[in-house]
C-alpha cells in the first residue's frame, strides 16, 4: 500500500560529490524524497546508526536502504526501473581524468598558502583537504587495481599524511598521482578486464563503473576548488 509505505529519505552532507549525484539522479527521474543533512540533523545521524551505517549518501525507505553511489540499488529502493547509461570507453575515461587532474593542479597552484586552511561552506573540510582529496581519489583506485588494496570508505577520508604540509607538498603529490595514472594505463590499463567486479565498499559494480566514478568524483571536487578561487577573489 503506497499510502502507508515509509517515505523515501536521502541522507547526505554538504561538499559530498556523491551525495549531489544521488539527489540529481532521483530528481531527474521525478522521485520525491526527504532530504536529510546529517551534519545538521541529529535525528538523521541516529537513523543511519540504527541501520548500522556511518557513511553517506544513503537512500532509505524504512529499514530498506542502498548506498547512493549505486544507482541500480537506489532505483530499487525508490521504486522505478533503472536504465543504465552508456559509459565511455575506459581509455576515454582515463583521458578525462587526466584533464580533470591537470585543471585541479592549476587551481591549487593559485590558492595562496595562507588560504589553504580556509574551510568550505557548511562542511568541516579545508581547501587543503579538498585539494588532497581530489588526487587521493585516483590514488585509491590505483592502489586497488595495482596492489589489490581494499577500496574502503575509510581510504577516501581526506586525512593528509604527515609529510604533506605545504602547497608545494600538495602539488608534488598531485604530480606523483598523475604520473602513476599515466604509467598504469600505458603498461597495464589497456589489458585490464573492466567487466570484472569492482570489489568496492559501496556495492556490486564493475571495475568500469569504479573507473567512471573516479573521474566524476575528482571532477565534482575540482569544481569546488574552482569555486574556492572565486570565493577568495582569484
Where in the sequence are the language-model features?
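Local sequence-structure signature of Cys/Sec-based thiol-disulfide redox active-site neighborhoods
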Residues: 1-32
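Class I S-adenosyl-L-methionine
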Residues: 20-27, 49, 105, 182
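Thiol-based oxidoreductase modules, predominantly thioredoxin-like and allied folds used
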Residues: 31-44
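BRCT (BRCA1 C-terminal) domain core and associated BRCT-interaction motifs
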Residues: 42-50, 55
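A short, hydrophobic beta-strand/beta-hairpin element that forms part of a small beta-sheet core
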Residues: 55-67
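Short, helix-capping/interhelical loops that line the mouth of catalytic, cofactor-
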Residues: 70, 75-98, 137-180, 184, ...
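Charged/polar low-complexity intrinsically disordered segments, enriched in acidic residues
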Residues: 99-107, 130
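Short, contiguous alpha-helical
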Residues: 115-160, 196-234
Amino acid at each position: 500500500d503506497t499510502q502507508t509505505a515509509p517515505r523515501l529519505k536521502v541522507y547526505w552532507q554538504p561538499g559530498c560529490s556523491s551525495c549531489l549525484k544521488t539527489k540529481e539522479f532521483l530528481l531527474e527521474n521525478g522521485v520525491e524524497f526527504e532530504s536529510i543533512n546529517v551534519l545538521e540533523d541529529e535525528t538523521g545521524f541516529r537513523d543511519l546508526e540504527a541501520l548500522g551505517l556511518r557513511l553517506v549518501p544513503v537512500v532509505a525507505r524504512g529499514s530498506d536502504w542502498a548506498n547512493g553511489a549505486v544507482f541500480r540499488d537506489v532505483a530499487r529502493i525508490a521504486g522505478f526501473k533503472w536504465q543504465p547509461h552508456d559509459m565511455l570507453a575506459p581509455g576515454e575515461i582515463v583521458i578525462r581524468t587526466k584533464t580533470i587532474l591537470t585543471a585541479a593542479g592549476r587551481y591549487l597552484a593559485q590558492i595562496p598558502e595562507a588560504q589553504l586552511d580556509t574551510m568550505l561552506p557548511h562542511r568541516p573540510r579545508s581547501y587543503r583537504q579538498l585539494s588532497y582529496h581530489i588526487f587521493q581519489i585516483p590514488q585509491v583506485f590505483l592502489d586497488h587495481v595495482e596492489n589489490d588494496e581494499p577500496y574502503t570508505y575509510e581510504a577516501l577520508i581526506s586525512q593528509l599524511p604527515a609529510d604533506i604540509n605545504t602547497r608545494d607538498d600538495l602539488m608534488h603529490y598531485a604530480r606523483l598521482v598523475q604520473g602513476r595514472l599515466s604509467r598504469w594505463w600505458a603498461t597495464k590499463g589497456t589489458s585490464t578486464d573492466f567487466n570484472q567486479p569492482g570489489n568496492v565498499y559501496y556495492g556490486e559494480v564493475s571495475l568500469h563503473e569504479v573507473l567512471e566514478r573516479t573521474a566524476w568524483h575528482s571532477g565534482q571536487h575540482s569544481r569546488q576548488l574552482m569555486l574556492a578561487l572565486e570565493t577568495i577573489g582569484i
